[in-house]
Amino acid sequence: MDSTSRRVVFFSNEFPNDDLKELFRRLDQHSKDRRFRLLSIFLEESTAVLKDEVSKLPRPLKELVPPFDSVLGLVDVDFRQGPLGAAMESSMLTILELGLFIGYVSLLCLLDQVKMLTSLVYTSHYESEDTEWDLVPGESVLAGLSIGILAAAAVALSSSLADVAKTGAEAVRVSFRLGVYVADISTKLETPQSDGTLSSWAHVVTEMTEAGVQDELRQFNTDTHSPELTKVFISAADKTSVSVSGPPSRIKAAFQHSPVLRYSKSLPLPVYDGLCHASHLYTQSDIDSIINSAESVIVADRSVRLALLSSQTGKPFIAKTASELFLEIGTELLTGTIYLDNVTAGIVQHLQPQSKEISSWQIDSFRTSLVLRGIHSAVEAKLSGEQRQLIRRDLVNWVNKDFGPRQPRSHASSKLAIVGMACRLPGGANDLDLFWKLLEEGRDTLTTVPPDRFDLNTHYDPTGKTENATQTPYGNFIDRPGFFDAGFFNMSPREAEQTDPMQRLALVTAYEALEMAGVVPGRTPSTHPSRIGTFYGQASDDWRELNASQNISTYAVPGGERAFGNGRINYFFKFSGPSFNLDTACSSGLAAVQAACSALWAGEVDTAIAGGLNVITDPDNYCGLGNAHFLSKTGQCKVWDKDADGYCRADGIGSVVIKRLEDAEADNDNILAVVLGASTNHSAEAISITHPHAGAQKANYRQVLNQAGVNPIDVSYIELHGTGTQAGDAVESESVSDIFAPVTPRRRPDQRLYLGAVKSNIGHGEAAAGIASLLKALLVYQKNLIPMHIGIKSVINPTIPKDLERRNVGLAMQNTPWPRPAGKKRLAVVNSFGAHGGNTTLLLEDAPERVKIQGTEDRITHSILLSAKSKKSLQANMESLLSYLDQHPETSLADLAYTTSSRRMHHNMRFGTSVSCISGLQKVLRSQLDNVNFASEVRPVPNEAPSVILAFTSQGAYYHGMGRELFAEFPYFRAQVQQLDRLAQRLGFPSVVPVIENSIEDTPSSPILTQLSVVILEIALARFWSLLGVSISAVIGHSLGEYAALAVAGVISATDAIYLVGRRAQLVEERCAQGSHSMLSVRAPEDEIQKMLAAEPETASIAYEVSCCNTNQDTVIGGLTGEINDIRRTLEAKSIKCTILDVPYAFHTAQVNPILDDLETLAKAVPFKAPSIPVISPLLATVIYDVKSLNANYLRRATRETVDFAAAIEAAQDMGLVDSKTIWIDVGPHPICAGLVRSMIPSAPAMSSCRRNEDSIATISKSLVTLYLAGINPCWAEFFKPREREYSLLHLPKYRWNEIDYWIPYLGTWTLDKAHLKHGTKPTTPFSVSMSRPSALRTSLVHQITAETVEATTATLHTISDMQHPDFLEAIHGHTMNKCGVATSSIWSDMAFTVGEYLYRRLVPNTKDVHMNLTDVEVLHAQVASKTKGSVQPLVLRAHLDLSTSSMSLSWFNANGETGECAAESFATAMIRFEDPMAWRKEWARLAHLVRGRIEVLEQRASEGKASRLSKPLAYALFKNVVDYADRYRGMDSVVLDELEAMAEVTLVPERYGTWHTPPHWIDSVSHLAGLVMNGSDASNTRDYFFVTPGCDSFRLLKKLEPGAQYRSYVRMFPLPEDPNMHGGDVYILQGEEIVGMVGMIRIRRVPRLLMDRFFSPPTTTSVAGPVPPLSGETTKYHDIAQTAPALPAPTLPIVVPNPVASSTMASKAPEPAPLLATSSESSTPKESPIVTPAESEREDPVDNNMISQCLRLMARETGLEVEALTADASFVQLGVDSLMSLVLSEKFRAELGVEIKSSLFLECPTIGEMTAWIEEYC
């Protein structure tokens, strides 16, 4: 406050004359705004105080207070007639005044932001809630009357607004206690009237003096002998009036007794609860009992900060502390007399100016009262004649205002936005448009039960005599309930058939609702998959109990159990938020929505998908509902009709997508409506469990209204539950009318309340009923029309309240406009009640009016994308879009591009184009759809995106304005350029921004500016591509572009790149003459140029240098300018195309020699690091993976020597980094490198970042489309982010499904027949396995003994282990292949030794040492660790020891983690022989010198360079081509490798890392040398194959391996004559000179490398998965893959879990595959580019490019058959395609044709004809 003003804040003792309920509602609404955080704290603290005080009341008083969650919940309760009237009135007045004050002052903090308070003028220095506020001692004073003084005291004790929130709650406590105490004392003086009539305890008398009134009262009290306690007395007085107080009957008697009083002007005051200001009644002990109670949490020593005037003396209270102040106030309230004249005088005295500088007086109050008007008059009288202003401020006005969009204080304070919806409803309402049309036309969807549900001829009996038959034939049913796109949702036909149709349609409608909402998981924080949950209501299991139970299959549980309905949605979309399936009977759907809202308010999710599900098939439910008298026998739900006789059943599926409002607005969503409140309660007091209860329904309405702070009169539409039952309609009409259209206050004529009930149209959808009602309400909001009610067939039900019309409420009997009032929002309520007693209510309001930002749209080209998972769907989606555009030609192209790219989930079948107008798009779509070869030309993209290489151009592409549009449009790109530019300027170089902005003069730039501009642009472009979601696999730089490439690869920093380029340019300018040398681009290879020039005398002696070998046909040469011109003339004369390059210097020639030394010196100061991504080097013509080759000398050479771009590309191809599918992005001002790449690899997709004379945004847009069609998923959200507010999400036609009917009909009459069955079945208990029992044998790998038998000479042992146990799992993950943990055979070795020693000691207890020879090891199926956390992965080991043969057999089996059932066949077997170690020692002693000799030979050959010596890192890097070992497994310190022979120095890690017999990592370390030989030697074809071991003949250790000990291993592998694909060898383990162990005849098999991914699949991604074939797995035997399963330490192969195939009875179509890529080069893309098709160079035969032909040729080649033999009826079994060949074929299809299929497809499509038909549709 300005120090030149004086301020008084006056707290009244009366409520304002406003609608108190509305005032509290508005306070509550503001408290949910984070800008009013302190108001919220105060209300929460006050609520807690009241709850605490109520809890301490005696039971009779406590029962008078209903449960409440906030003070708003008490506003509707009338306490005036009860003993708590004073307490509630006092505390609520305190809360109201302090709440208004806190909110008012909070606004002062917002003044700079909020300019909407035109009726108030504030001057404040508030900056935050914690700053010193403007109620300054000495300048501000507080005053009040009665209870108002308590509110003022809270302010007086506060030094900040935050203090008021805390002390204010204590003032509320004192107010409540004071009221309770006063009422209790007063009722002892006079009993309240029994009829509840309120009598006043105080009257005001005017035009009499205090003395005159006192005389009359004294006389009355004397004459009537009134006891002291009940006497009538004066409680307040001023010059013009006197307040008389006493028991009501005594006051009445006093006025009758005294003629003076009887004829005086007097009025009763609204004081109904007792006496205050009565010194004769209260004592200090009374005051102490209220103020100084032990429960009070007043801080006793809190100082009084502001003066508070006494209402008795008009002077400030003298108290210094809080406790003193409240005692003074309590004394005054209970015993003091109010003297208003003193209060006025005190205020005037405070305002009396002490200085001429005081320019204004300010009085803040809560509305104007008689008392306040008197104060104003007195102050104005004092001001008369003075140049001072009296400012009156009302602290109430602000509460009725809105201050811009609400900013929720917390999730719980947020409004919620419904942003998407979808449905399948009766009457053919398979989408929202059809549903609305049905409603608008007033259609009734009633029909009889369709035959596909059940046969009415047998299951319908209107007499009710037939047991289990229905008595009504009617219902409302959705069309084609079995139709489903199984392939889209990755389900096999078998699984789809077994899955409940309502769960299938939940998937479908969830997708459609998400599509409508524009949800792309992960696009925004609120749509991150971990923050999305699903909530669906379901109340029946018809499909599981009836249809699917006729033949229970594998998918019976996941297909039918309710939880899987939600779980499948979460799993498919990879949502990891909560998944709830709710059953609240008829209200399940809306209860699920309410649960979703609760989760959003609780912050458990950020996006929720909710809905209700019901598909009727089971006649049992018809019978049960009919027998319980729920169902109408006459037809449809007749809501509010006189003849209403029950409901009519209905199907229904509905889904909605909900977010918090602020998230929806931030995400640029279309908001269909806003949820203000949602609640569910129960009719606990109903007369029966199924009977509705009006009281419970009304309580629920109040809860929702209070939650939202909404006046029920403002609600203008209610969608009733409306079932059409006599009880239900009567009760709901009563509850709705009483709350929303009460008798008083009445609705105004313009406040009509309309009612509707969708069940009249589509029946009662049971669990889906609530969601259908909600969808209708949302459509009413969208269409601004309330559809006609068709439920009254005769006359209105007489049980409906008769006065509804007088209350201005009624059904909309015809289509009724429901316009949105200007500047206001419409409110609607949706009801849904459950037959079990539950009541759910939602309160909705209009979406915020969205003002679309009108930008200057200068993007001349837009990308339009469509995708699908099958060709039919893609074609249908294109047709739908074309039809939409034909109907809506005004559609914004920008909005369409935004919607189809940034706001869509994308699939594998893709269409994309870049267009500049809608008509152009229509033309492209028609062209594609008219193409008869559309199906064959459309190619799906691969599941695995192709690699992307960035190619950085040189300075030859420079021009002014390069990237200008990107710089202007994209803040991220602009920021990157500006940051790099600032670095350049700090290094002393000129700014490049004018070049990019094109604000520089169009004159030749200096080399420094040219080169810096190019490098900075390229680094910024590379980062921009990363922002757009492009993952870079490698980089290559051409000349100057190599600096940018090295920076992007992390070899040098961006700063160093700029520094080196700038200094290099400076050196060139200083030491090289411009124009003395030139560069010539020649369209010919180097050798031809040389020959042609040598043949001509004029040029034979010219010295030139080759600067660049760009392609095999493009060469750049350099030299002296004159000589280069001579060469040009000579070559052009020979018709060779030549171009003089527009560069001032001839780089990569002798001209730059003068700068090389200094350049290298500068570069030596720069740190070089290993590249983070491979660098393709045009200097070295290789791919660089490490830092060894990259140094200062490299940059020197790169400046001087030839840029061999062509050789670099060829090297990258040879090294497997580049193939025909690799995508190239030219990063630079103009696509020079892109052209070079296309010349080298004609089929290569190459695109540009910028292009001369083309808008760079358009260039990027086209390139993004090309990337998209190639299988890359760009981050479209970032592309549209700069202008997202300018775009609107369009509601386009929904996805067109490729549906097939998966329906299992109910056959027979067994639901009727079971009524006559008299026998039952005994349930069986499933087998279970417990792994927590004590076990005599427990190690890291052997966890529990499950069976043990020990006899005299034999013993048998069964153990069980869990591969997911941490120790076991860590052992497995020490040996990973293709990112999967695979059990190495050293694990089986340790388990064998563990069990062998245990059993042997059981039979021979006193044995000192047990020496075992592990023989005949055969691992049939590898074991791969499950990726599922928390899963159980058990395996069983069975061992049998026979002492008579000194041997033990072992077998390992997989077991089912749920049932404990052990597999029939083992996955590994072995033998242990208990032998004499002396025999081993003798055997090995004879061999030791031979082994040591071979080791010495290897050492010698290594020293001579004839054998390779590998360091530890290099050895395991070679190993990593197949297997990645953890550190503990990496025991080989060095290796000498000579073709198939090798030796290794080994040091075991000292740690055992667990409990073992022999740690697996030690076994592996001494023995996996054999695997390295086969997988790392030059003698092996490691490019096409990898090598694994299926077993060995023996494994022996003379003594136990020792921690930290050093060993040597030696092996020589050789081909086995019986199998050319198999190698074998012995691994010797030496310690010192002695052989201490041996792996005898380890066998290693060669396996095609293309099967690596098949056997070792990487972890699944979080994106929406691609389609899969119908089988979840297939059986692959070890021998079927040429015995390639693993044994000892070499890599091992997994086995796919068997899953027998059962053909579907209803559908046999296999689902679509993961798609393959179709791309074209950028140059072939027209300005309005249609769908991109395969480049001609990619096709094997330009004449025959049919995919079927390619597939047949591939199959013929791989099987060795002629193509002619592959006839349509030929079966794969007859053709010899076994499981191994199917694996190979599926990999070949992927690798060569880009077709992703599972090998199980050869089982699903057993003939050539079926296979080709499938390929034709999906490939």
Curated annotation (Swiss-Prot):
Annotated segments matching region N-terminal hotdog fold: 1343-1479
Name this protein carries in UniProt: Non-reducing polyketide synthase nscA
UniProt region (Malonyl-CoA:ACP transacylase (MAT) domain), positions on chain: 952-1249
Segment forming the signal sequence: none
MF GO annotations: 3-oxoacyl-[acyl-carrier-protein] synthase activity; fatty acid synthase activity; phosphopantetheine binding
Keywords on record: Acyltransferase, Multifunctional enzyme, Phosphopantetheine, Phosphoprotein, Transferase
Stretches assigned to the PKS/mFAS DH domain: 1343-1653
Gene3D superfamilies listed in its UniProt record: 3.30.70.3290, 3.40.47.10, ACP-like (1.10.1200.10), Malonyl-Coenzyme A Acyl Carrier Protein, domain 2 (3.40.366.10), Polyketide synthase dehydratase (3.10.129.110)
Gene: nscA
Record-annotated Ketosynthase family 3 (KS3) domain positions: 413-846
Ranges where the record places region C-terminal hotdog fold: 1507-1653
Domain comment as written in the entry: Multidomain protein; including a starter unit:ACP transacylase (SAT) that selects the starter unit; a ketosynthase (KS) that catalyzes repeated decarboxylative condensation to elongate the polyketide backbone; a malonyl-CoA:ACP transacylase (MAT) that selects and transfers the extender unit malonyl-CoA; a product template (PT) domain that controls the immediate cyclization regioselectivity of the reactive polyketide backbone; and an acyl-carrier protein (ACP) that serves as the tether of the growing and completed polyketide via its phosphopantetheinyl arm.
PROSITE patterns the UniProt entry points to: CARRIER, KS3_1, KS3_2, PKS_MFAS_DH
CC cofactor note: Binds 1 phosphopantetheine covalently.
Modification O-(pantetheine 4'-phosphoryl)serine, positions: 1779
Reported function: Non-reducing polyketide synthase; part of the gene cluster that mediates the biosynthesis of neosartoricin B, a prenylated anthracenone that probably exhibits T-cell antiproliferative activity, suggestive of a physiological role as an immunosuppressive agent. The non-reducing polyketide synthase nscA probably synthesizes and cyclizes the decaketide backbone. The hydrolase nscB then mediates the product release through hydrolysis followed by spontaneous decarboxylation. The prenyltransferase nscD catalyzes the addition of the dimethylallyl group to the aromatic C5.
InterPro entries assigned: Ac_transferase_dom_sf, ACP-like_sf, Acyl_transferase_dom, Acyl_Trfase/lysoPLipase, Ketoacyl_synth_AS, Ketoacyl_synth_C, Ketoacyl_synth_N, PKS_Beta-ketoAc_synthase_dom
Pathway recorded for this protein: Secondary metabolite biosynthesis
Enzyme class: transferase
Cofactor annotation: pantetheine 4'-phosphate
Transferase among keywords: yes
Region described as Product template (PT) domain: spans on this chain: 1339-1658
GO terms, biological process: fatty acid biosynthetic process; secondary metabolite biosynthetic process
